[in-house]
A protein has these predicted regions:
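Conserved FAD/dinucleotide-binding core of flavoprotein oxidoreductases
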Residues: 2-63, 98, 116, 120, ...
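C-terminal catalytic lobe of FAD-dependent flavoproteins
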Residues: 12, 28-50, 72-93, 98-105, ...
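An acidic- and aromatic-residue-enriched active-site/binding cleft used to recognize and process polar
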Residues: 21-23, 86, 149
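Generic structural "secondary-structure junction" signal
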Residues: 53, 66, 71, 95, ...
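A general structural signal for short secondary-structure boundary/capping elements
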Residues: 53-58, 65-67, 125-128, 176-183, ...
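FAD-binding beta-loop-beta segment adjacent to the flavin cofactor pocket
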Residues: 62-94, 136, 141-144, 159-160
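Active-site-proximal substrate-binding core of FAD-dependent oxidoreductases
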Residues: 90, 108-162
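C-terminal auxiliary extensions adjacent to catalytic cores
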Residues: 154-198
Length: 198
């Protein structure tokens, strides 16, 4: 319905995961219950045939923290290491919402840091600082820093979800149409849709 968000289908070994992603503000603005948004997605002509005959085995909802680096809490304390959603390790990049990869990597790093702290006999905040150091050296914090302002950019640039994807579609379509006519140059094929968006 033109709302900021997205949907996904993940193929697993024996199951398929189907879901939607919507910001709280869009859910309120759209005035459509989240479960109805999911049903609307499942009933799309591109999706319905893929899941037809499937049996619902699990249903869940999850609020994803989009605070990112700016809202990240202290990552270590006495006897505590924080990772994943609890540490605001999530990024909305417009085309995807990342979090699972960051949580898994941070969890692995947390395990290594905890093992080091236990071996050293020091699970205090100071003894667990190696987690922060290892995390800073990993792709997790590098990516969190790289994309820390992206949520604000997305909110200020709604064209990312409508006009730009349509522009890309309009550029790509003529490249794959065989109609017996000579092809325009790539530049000419691209310029019309680009000018239309501005």
């Amino acid at each position: 319905n033109g709302a900021i968000g997205g949907a996904f289908i993940y193929t697993n070994e024996d199951t398929v995961s189907v879901g939607i992603v919507a910001t709280m503000s869009e859910v309120i603005k759209q005035d459509i219950p989240v479960y109805q948004m999911l049903e609307n997605f499942k009933n799309r002509p591109e999706i319905a045939p893929v899941i037809r005959g499937g049996k619902l085995v699990e249903y869940s909802g999850h609020v994803v923290p989009e605070g990112g680096l700016k809202m990240m809490p202290e990552l270590v304390g006495n006897g505590v290491i924080v990772a994943g959603d609890a540490a605001m390790m999530c990024m909305n990049l417009g085309y995807t919402v990342r979090g699972m990869d960051l949580a898994i990597a941070a969890g692995q790093i947390a395990g290594k840091a905890a093992a080091q702290a236990l071996d050293a006999g020091d699970t205090s905040k100071a003894g667990l600082q190696c987690y922060k150091t290892m995390l800073d050296d990993s792709f997790v914090m590098r990516d969190m820093k790289q994309y820390q302002n992206f949520p604000e950019f997305l909110e200020e640039c709604p064209r990312m979800f409508n006009e730009y994807p349509e522009m890309i579609r309009d550029i790509m379509n003529p490249m794959f149409i065989v109609d017996g006519k000579p092809r325009q140059s790539m530049k000419k094929m691209a310029m019309g849709p680009v000018k239309k968006v501005g």
